[in-house]
Amino acid sequence: MKAIDSIPVGVSGTKSVEVTREMTVAHFQEHMPAVYGTPIMIYHMEVTAAELIQQYLPDGWVSVGVVVDVKHLAATPVGATVTVRAKVLAADDNTVTFEVEAHDGVDKIGEGTHVRAPVEIGRFLKRVQAKTQRMDEASLRKQT
């Protein structure tokens, strides 16, 4: 049985956040308006999707984001509450595909799809550690 076999298609979840100045484009680029930033919206979509399926994954497993295809449709000011919804569209092969949306109480501000891959955390971290070692070795070769 694969880790994704227990993830039900159609299950959905939501997460709400109040937009703070730290979530705005202006926090990162002072000359820009203080509105909810696209990277932060995508982050909230990813977190909502990850938290939704975590309960269905075996112990020692997490999911990592592998594809994001999102449109940011409308600006949202500081103080507004953004609600993100993630819905499982498919759980096949080794990935889970989600429909994601964000609303600010007035407008739909974002929509798209997101794909996550469940991974066994121990194996994943070993691969990251091996890559870190290869990078360190490559850096040493460049210095000589």
Protein language model regions, located:
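Intrinsic-disorder/low-complexity, polar/charged segments enriched in Ser/Thr/Lys/Arg/Asp/Glu/Gln
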Residues: 8-14, 40, 67, 81-83, ...
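Generic structural detector for well-ordered beta-strands
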Residues: 16-20, 71, 113-117
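Flexible, active-site-adjacent loop/turn segments at secondary-structure boundaries
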Residues: 22-26, 30-34, 55, 62, ...
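Hydrophobic beta-strand-centered segment that forms part of the acyl-chain substrate-binding groove
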Residues: 50-83
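HotDog/MaoC-like acyl-thioester-processing domains
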Residues: 78, 87-144
